[in-house]
């Protein structure tokens, strides 16, 4: 795959696809983490004299976070300490004329790419090439830099459509993500421990099955709803209240799949030995083997218990590779953040090379000032897809582009 330093950029127009899709409240972006992650790439292109055309999506149609990219241009202006213009168009005449008029070192931000219907559905590279987005924009750009790792599991025009039309290059963030995840996945250093929590149960099951079957993991620690699912699959009763919740979330249908994984890899999948319930507004820890587990019938499980944290901590401190995705409980409530803080702090203290991803995981790391993680991934779904052993469309497109245009480097 092409890397950023492979090309000269002076006076060349670069379409820079990033993922600045950020949490919003009352129409305002409340986290600039994804902006900061792509700054090295943008600064390098500016310093190299490129004309930088930034493209990103924000939210999904009809969602509260679906908005224009005017705010994104403003935040980039502040972070870069220069004027970054918001262009209220994507590939129409106005956008194309504005791109043609750009000067070296200038940066503009196109309108939310998902305002174009072509950008909302996944399609093959061949289909993406035929879109108006790719056909029109390719007339006014020279190179494509893709730094949108968080969207790497999607196959949409702005992400893969230019691969055979223009040289498509990894940005610094994409490069860093691919290198870190590959290092964790391919490592022979043992023990290799995967920590799977949160609510993305089906994705986590795919990861567990893949890394155990391909002998990429030596142990899997579970928490969050993933931990509850595997606990059920082991035959424990989590009570009426919690079963009802799991059913409502559509998680009970995965019990058979979890049982199948346990049948094949039982010693390698660890589940919580205790849970914390919300007992009338207070944290109460219940051992799975105690009589108090009857309280599961009436009170919701919101975290793993302290004994589980201690057992997981011992394992993590001896690990050489750690991959983690998803919190251990409802960390937004301080009394139920014990599991997430304890496990993530142990990962930070471990000598292991560690990778943590997922929006909620990252939010908890920043909220509780957890340090010592080797690599914090910007991709949740993309990271899970990678460790599930599935192909990421954007990485495949980068490989195709390299094969097509590698003669440019000779």
UniProtKB/Swiss-Prot annotation:
**Family annotation (Pfam families):** PGK (PF00162)
Q: Which residues participate in ATP binding?
A: 332, 358-361
E.C. number(s) listed in UniProt = 2.7.2.3
Question: Per its UniProt record, what PROSITE patterns does this chain match?
Answer: PGLYCERATE_KINASE
Write out the residues that bind substrate.
Answer: 19-21, 34, 57-60, 114, 154
Task: Spell out the reaction equation it catalyses.
Answer: (2R)-3-phosphoglycerate + ATP = (2R)-3-phospho-glyceroyl phosphate + ADP
The UniProt GO MF terms for this protein read: ADP binding; ATP binding; phosphoglycerate kinase activity
**Alphabetical keyword list:** ATP-binding, Cytoplasm, Glycolysis, Kinase, Nucleotide-binding, Transferase
InterPro entries according to UniProt: Phosphoglycerate_kinase (IPR001576), Phosphoglycerate_kinase_CS (IPR015911), Phosphoglycerate_kinase_N (IPR015824), Phosphoglycerate_kinase_sf (IPR036043)
Q: In which pathway does it act?
A: Carbohydrate degradation; glycolysis; pyruvate from D-glyceraldehyde 3-phosphate: step 2/5
Principal EC category:
transferase
| GO biological process annotation, one example | glycolytic process
Q: What is the protein's name according to its record?
A: Phosphoglycerate kinase
